[in-house]
Regions:
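Post-Walker A alpha-helix
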Residues: 16-17
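Glycine-rich, often acidic-flanked micro-motifs
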Residues: 2-6, 22-144
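Conserved lysine of the Walker
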Residues: 13
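Walker A/P-loop nucleotide-binding motif
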Residues: 9
């Protein structure tokens, strides 16, 4: 089961995923630390590792079913809530590749809509304590 974390640049995505690796040890596998490839079908979403794996060079050549997308926000206390796709739509559009060609951009937006029907969405307020990883996991695992 895969979880994808997204946020504005500098929010702490790499820091948070590092907490997952610290908390879960070898059970936490990084598919891609920067730009995973998402295959979106009517049957679900699969996340794949790619060579574009960011400054930390963390990527695994695998594909995993994507269960949830979690929007990270900084907070003094750790908390997570399930949210609607509509509430995070703007963030999703900002984070995907947006073609200049209008027809291709429309297709991208349609894929986001299909993805929204097949993936759970969460908003995580977190600090840099290892308990943030546990909070995120416990909040999202119930939606499997």
């Amino acid at each position: 089961i895969g979880y994808l974390f997204t946020a504005k640049s500098g929010t702490g995505k790499s820091t948070h995923t590092n907490l997952w690796r610290e908390f879960f040890k070898e059970r936490a596998v990084m598919v891609n630390d920067d730009k995973p490839l998402l295959r979106v079908t009517e049957n679900g979403v699969t996340a794949y590792g790619t060579p574009w794996n960011g400054k930390h060079r963390l990527s695994t050549n695998i594909g995993v079913p994507l269960n949830a997308i979690c929007v990270l926000e900084r907070s003094d206390e750790n908390h997570i809530e399930k949210v609607t796709a509509e509430s995070v739509y703007n963030m999703l559009v900002q984070q995907v590749y947006r073609p200049q060609n209008p027809q291709k951009l429309l297709k991208t937006l349609q894929l986001i809509d299909v993805m929204a029907d097949n993936v759970n969405f969460y908003r995580l307020g977190c600090n840099m304590d290892i308990s943030a990883a546990e909070t995120a996991y416990n909040g999202m695992k119930g939606s499997i």
